[in-house]
Swiss-Prot record:
Family: Belongs to the bacterial ribosomal protein bS16 family.
Pfam families: Ribosomal_S16 (PF00886)
Protein encoded by which gene: rpsP
Protein's organism: Staphylococcus aureus (strain NCTC 8325 / PS 47)
InterPro entries: Ribosomal_bS16 (IPR000307), Ribosomal_bS16_dom_sf (IPR023803)
Protein name, as recorded: Small ribosomal subunit protein bS16
């Protein structure tokens, strides 16, 4: 089973809010998920609001889940991808 870390869209029209989730790559965008690991609000007042459970994200990355391009950028901004790369090089 190919697993991806990706965004599912919530919120109303022209006011998006996203959950960062782990899901089977074959399931629909807003379909069944395996686990929610964070949220992303691009329309918050000052700057985009990002909340990610770092331990869960690293667990899924180490288990082989592939992040989408957008989620990869979000995790990079949070410093999670850097920690993942360091863990991978240490092995």
């Amino acid at each position: 089973m190919a697993v991806k870390i990706r965004l599912t869209r919530l919120g109303s029209k022209r006011n998006p809010f996203y959950r960062i989730v782990v899901a089977d790559a074959r399931s629909p965008r807003d379909g069944r998920i395996i686990e929610q690991i964070g949220t992303y609000n691009p329309t918050s007042a000052n700057a985009p609001e990002i909340k990610v459970d770092e331990a869960l994200a690293l667990k899924w990355l180490n288990d082989g889940a592939k992040p989408t391009d957008t989620v990869h950028n979000i995790l990079s901004k949070e410093g999670i991808m850097k920690k993942f790369d360091e863990q991978k090089k240490a092995k």
